[in-house]
């Protein structure tokens, strides 16, 4: 079943959840542990309490219900189900076993797990939700629900639901709703209202197709509304052309919003939770510089970020594509920060922003011991800091200024008296080092980016 967009955080709070993961060929034990820890944080963000974890090593997800027969019964014992998959479920053959063989490993059907049910446990205390750390098919979700008696969510559905809960601006809500409907459409057969449709196969299929058509029409309507908003965004971006722009990019909960607040003094939302920020915020670096430097905070990334969400948030991610400098913000205290950085680079590569100049910012250094800090300092082109330390923020601000200063050139400009109205444009986008007057107009000695100089010369010609 897809997660309901109307399920509130309060309704979920206190509900128990079991995490399920299949370790596929090529996935190390360390990678699996990191993925499950991250899934646990995602599930907790939705308000659930994680009480057990069931894992299994397989060549591929079981076609019927994700897990093999024995491990499925173990999971059902935890949730109070019977552990029986409806007959007629298809089997699937894959080439994955060859990968295990090439690695010299054997893929056992069952892997022992410490999470076993308590004898005589009250059904009211049993987990009501199963969360699978893979994107699964509607039939797999249905079979897993029947075998365990619990609601089933997959990783994609969890992320989509978190985005739905945290979207605040109209643009973000439209983007998330498009992604949610794309996720829900193929899962309509799983809806709880399907009993009447099952009376006749033909009638049921017709009803489902009608619902899907309604969803397609709704998506088209939402995309029209989103296009209008994005046109306004593009107009604002066009107005900002020629300005110095820095984009904060990175994994979710890396501390981008905290850095945004520290650099700009703006009261942006700062919360210690995944995907607290979905809306792009643009503010000026403080204290203000001449020319102004604009800082933008962007949506965070995560491993296995659903493609529909990446597509929906493409216009938001374009802030990174159009920036002069990217600050890759990384939570240095997270043991998996190297892998998180690779996820960030991969997403930015997907949108064509891999060649934008960048600076690596290892944040949350206040959580590191001296040895860990010393090890990180050996990295090149890296700043190690804490967004809560004013000295570190000052150092980051200076690094930003130095980046732009290094790209500026010094030139002479003549502003004719007939075009004195352009003086404001010059002062806004360049550093004016000297100003004098003669019979032809105002002569200025300025420092600015080459592109800015070229634009000003064209306007003054």
Task: Label each PLM-derived region with a short phrase.
Residues 39, 130, 181, 215, ...:
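Residue-level signature of catalytic and energy-coupling elements of molecular machines
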Residues 26-31, 60-65, 166-172, 206-207, ...:
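Flexible beta-alpha connector loops of hexameric P-loop NTPases
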Residues 1-155:
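N-terminal accessory targeting/assembly segments
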Residues 399, 425-429, 456-461:
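Short amphipathic alpha-helices in soluble, non-transmembrane regions
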Residues 23-28, 58, 62, 131-138, ...:
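Conserved Switch II/interswitch segment of TRAFAC-class P-loop GTPases
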Residues 2, 8-17, 27, 191, ...:
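Conserved G1/Walker A P-loop phosphate-binding module
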Residues 147-199, 203, 354-359, 364-417:
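Canonical P-loop GTPase G-domain recognition
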